[in-house]
């Protein structure tokens, strides 16, 4: 009788077990419609007060963007402002809204000639984030103050043609540091690109 229960238990246990095949997710194949890109690993370069970083996004030997930090004293409001900027030069464009801010893009967000609420401008100075320093305490402002691996849209104009791209950024308010991870720019003119692709 004991052996019968043991055999029945083992038989039931074997029937209740089933092999589960693991789900293997493969990376998506490259999109046949996405343009070929030039990528740069920026090695998580840090930009702090008193520092700046030039970026040659299209590898043509001249800088396209400048990231810098400025300390501005405001005696009227009795506060200081530690400001983190992204700057573009002639024929290098950043998206601007009416407050001179640029959108924070997520991975795979589209970047093209138009972006609702924003306009491409060359020779731009975009305030990414700022620390407001007062006698009553400090605070942070700006669209980019809490980002981690988000994308700044950029546009390069060469020979009258537009090339779209992005710079991957993070921000650390504790260290008061802007972090530059990667950049990408299309090699094909007037093509929509995906942020981070």
Per-range role (PLM):
Residues 9-10, 51:
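Residue-level detector of alpha-helix boundary/anchor positions
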Residues 167:
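Short beta-strand-centered aromatic/proline hotspots
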Residues 2-8:
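Sec-dependent signal peptide recognition
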């Amino acid at each position: 009788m004991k052996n019968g229960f043991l055999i029945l238990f083992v038989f039931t246990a074997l029937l209740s077990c089933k092999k589960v095949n693991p789900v293997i997710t493969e990376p998506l194949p490259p999109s046949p419609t996405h343009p070929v890109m030039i990528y740069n690993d920026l090695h998580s370069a840090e930009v702090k007060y008193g520092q700046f970083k030039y970026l040659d996004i299209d590898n043509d030997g001249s800088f396209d963007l400048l990231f810098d930090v400025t300390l501005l004293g405001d005696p009227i409001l009795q506060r200081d402002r530690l400001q983190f900027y992204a700057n573009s030069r002639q024929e290098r464009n950043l998206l601007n809204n009416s407050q001179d801010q640029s959108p924070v893009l997520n991975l795979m967000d589209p970047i093209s000639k138009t972006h609702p609420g924003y306009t491409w401008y060359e020779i731009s100075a975009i305030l990414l984030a700022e620390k407001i320093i007062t006698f009553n305490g400090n605070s942070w402002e700006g669209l980019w103050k809490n980002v981690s691996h988000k994308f700044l849209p950029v546009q390069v104009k060469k020979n009258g043609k537009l090339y779209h791209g992005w710079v991957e950024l993070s921000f650390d308010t504790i260290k008061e540091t802007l972090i530059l991870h990667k950049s990408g720019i299309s090699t094909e003119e007037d093509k929509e690109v995906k942020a981070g692709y």
